[in-house]
Each structure stands twice: as C-alpha cells, then as structure tokens.
Amino acid sequence: MRPFEDSPISRDGKVLILAYDHGLEHGPVDFEAVPATKDPEAVWDVATHDAVSAMAAQKGIAEAYYPSYSDDVNLLAKLNGTSNLWMGEPDSAVNWTVDYAADVGADAVGFTLYGGSNSEVEMAEEFRDAQEAARDHDLPVVMWSYPRGQGLKNDKNPDTIAYAARQALELGADIAKVKYPGSTDAMSHAVDMAGPTNVVMSGGSKTSDRDFLESVKGAIDAGASGLAVGRNVWQREHPAAFLDGLEAVVYEEASVDEALGRI
C-alpha cells in the first residue's frame, strides 16, 4: 500500500471529497434546493475545481459519467448504499465490487459501516472483503463510520465519534469519515483515537457559510485531514466560490474570515 500522501485523492496530505451519493441515500429531496443538481453532470462539473481531491459516487453515476471526467476528477467509488425508503435497522447493500470499481477507474473506495446497528457484524465482514481487495489494487479505503442503531441515543456524542474513528483504525481504513462532534477538542479526541488513520469531517445538512467554515476550521485545527462534503457545496447558488473558501481553510489553514473573503 502506497503512503496516503502519494495517493491521487490526497493533495499535500489533505483531502476534500465532494460527495454525490445522495440520490440513492436521500432521494430527490436533496435536489429541490438547487434543481440543476439532479443532473449529475452539473455536480461533476463542480468536482473539476482544484480544491476537490476526489468525487464520491455510486456505481451507476460512475459508469455513466466518469469516463467523460476521468482526466479532471479522481473517483472515489462508494461501494455500498441503501435508499431512504428502507425502514429497517440501519444497513447498507454492497452494490459493486472493488474489482469492478477498479475497472471503472476508481482512485479510492468508500464503504459505510453502521457501528451499533444490528447489522454491524455483517457490515464489518463485508468491509473486510472490500478492504482486502482494495489492498490488492493499491486503492485507499475510506470508511463512512456512522454509529447508528436502536440503542444509540446521540450519534454526535464526542465519545461515540471517537469510537467511530477508532473502529475505522481497528478494521483497516485509511480514512475515517465521521460527523463533527461540535468542538475542536472533541474532534481532537477522535483524531487521537484514530492513530495513523486519517480523519475527515462529514459535511451534513447545509448550513450558513460562516457556520460551516467554522466547523471545518475546528476540524482542521483538531488535526483532521480534511472533509467529505456534498450538500454544503452543491446546494449553494455559487458552489465554485464556496470551494474557494474551503480550499483556503483545508489546504492553507486560513482563518474563517480570510476564507469568507474569497467567496
């Protein structure tokens, strides 16, 4: 396995992943704010911004659109995912193999694990297979480490987020994608628990420019390696301008006010 810093999805040891798996996970509701984003080409175009180190997409979106963008965008193949129509205990279907993702041209793979769900054991075993196959292809592995389940009362509790980051390390992920636990100190705890596994902040629902940049700044100051963001970029009227601001915070460690000045 090559060092993470040498991976195509890394820029100077940092990552900014543009996520676009929402059509499966959330459905059409996520495209209502900016109707143009229902067209995948509109978001692939956003992903050509220099700040974006990879775009996360499901199988069908990658098959249909990545060939036209392979020279300008690094592909993070999101291997599993389930619709919001599913009403059972949190789980996620494996929709394509690492081997097939590599054939499509993936530069990395992503996999959701719902720690605490009744499906955790099965999902961990599926992650094992994906992680080991990714090693054969020299592809970095990003774990969407999201604790969920009937017994979990607060999925943003600092100890829960730290556990999620640690779980990613223990199971062999190169990057742990976790929710921001609300403060730099709490995020630092998660980063510490992850050891050599890089931690990135999950973007979540759209917030104001300042609020989101402050969360990203808090994560970077805590030692996070970047973020994976979808709605907080492509639900904005001017996504490229907002990426200018994120680029300043993630790669240049600029202040929030400096970043706002670039938007």
Curated annotation (Swiss-Prot):
The record, for InterPro entries, names: Aldolase_TIM, DeoC/FbaB/LacD_aldolase, DeoC/FbaB_aldolase, FbaB-like
Q: Which reaction does it catalyse?
A: beta-D-fructose 1,6-bisphosphate = D-glyceraldehyde 3-phosphate + dihydroxyacetone phosphate
Q: Which pairs are disulfide-linked?
A: none
Q: Does the keyword Flavoprotein apply?
A: no
Gene Ontology BP annotations: aromatic amino acid family biosynthetic process; glycolytic process
Which ranges of the sequence are coiled-coil?
none
The superkingdom of the source organism is Archaea
What keywords are annotated for this sequence in UniProt?
A: Glycolysis, Lyase, Schiff base
Read off the SUPFAM superfamilies from this record: Aldolase
The record's Gene3D superfamilies line, in alphabetical order, gives: Aldolase class I
- State the Gene Ontology terms under molecular function: acyltransferase activity, transferring groups other than amino-acyl groups; fructose-bisphosphate aldolase activity
The UniProt entry annotates the active site at: 177 (schiff-base intermediate with substrate)
Give EC number(s), comma-separated. Answer: 4.1.2.13
Task: Write down the Pfam families for this protein, in alphabetical order.
Answer: DeoC
The family note in this entry says: Belongs to the DeoC/FbaB aldolase family.
What is the protein's known function?
Has aldolase activity with fructose 1,6-bisphosphate. May play a role in the biosynthesis of aromatic amino acids (AroAA).
This protein is called Fructose-bisphosphate aldolase class 1
